[in-house]
Amino acid sequence: MSGMVRGIRGATYIEKNEADCIIRETKLLLLEIVEKNQIKAEDICSILFTSTSGLNASFPAMAARELGWKYVPMLCSVEIDVPDSLQNCVRVLMHVNTFLKQDQIKHVYLKEAKKLRDDL
């Protein structure tokens, strides 16, 4: 596929700092992003993950690896600890090759993370 490289944002809330919770919720987020935007793994250029400082039981990128996305470059980082911001949150920036226009991209915010972008 060619087209353009576009960024797709997403975030979800993780109830407990446990590896299975982080991986399960991140996997659900990734699956919803690819479904809503009709993306195949080979269309994904890269994924950046951030998590708030209280989530360190697993790398969120493990969720993508469990989905079989072994050729997608990924990076995990800690989100800036802004006072009064949403905690226990994994954020995603997925770069994809797509023919969708910017206003056709469907960003995905789940659970308590919906309040991060209530304009969408």
Label the model's feature ranges.
Residues 1-120:
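Terminal domain-initiation and capping elements
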